[in-house]
Amino acid sequence: MDLLKSLEEEQLRKDLPEFRPGDTVKVYFKVIEGNRERIQPYEGVVIRKRGSGLSATFTVRRVSYGIGVERTFPLHSPRIEKIEVIRRGKVRRARLYYLRKLTGKAARIAERR
């Protein structure tokens, strides 16, 4: 069991910023197309964080051309170049699934001070 924990700690990334559900983040994700590799930024609101250790994931939601798009990223993935926290949101829930039903101004999140 100790061997597994030591291997997992070796793989954990320590360069990631602290963020919570409700925060607006920009995730720079490496996309591999054939033999080319490029970095694709994805900006949106974190609606959920789950898990711990290497299996931790987070889901980012954004509205693109009027359609809500959600993408789940593994937190410690080597394909994540970096994560920028754009603004901190003030919410009282850990899972923000209610944002799926809201549109326009109702879907805004107050900024945390």
UniProtKB/Swiss-Prot annotation:
A GO-annotated cellular component: cytosolic large ribosomal subunit
Listed Gene3D superfamilies: 2.30.30.790
GO molecular function, one term: structural constituent of ribosome
Pfam families cross-referenced by the UniProt entry: Ribosomal_L19
The keyword Ribosomal protein is assigned to this record: yes
Coiled-coil boundaries: none
GO biological process: translation
Keyword vocabulary terms for this entry: Ribonucleoprotein, Ribosomal protein
InterPro entries registered for this protein in UniProt: Ribosomal_bL19 (IPR001857), Ribosomal_bL19_CS (IPR018257), Ribosomal_bL19_sf (IPR038657), Translation_prot_SH3-like_sf (IPR008991)
Listed NCBIfam families: rplS_bact (TIGR01024)
HAMAP family: Ribosomal_bL19 (MF_00402)
The protein's role, per its UniProt record: This protein is located at the 30S-50S ribosomal subunit interface and may play a role in the structure and function of the aminoacyl-tRNA binding site.
Family: Belongs to the bacterial ribosomal protein bL19 family.
Name of protein: Large ribosomal subunit protein bL19
Organism: Carboxydothermus hydrogenoformans (strain ATCC BAA-161 / DSM 6008 / Z-2901)
Species classification: Bacteria, Bacillati, Bacillota, Clostridia, Thermoanaerobacterales
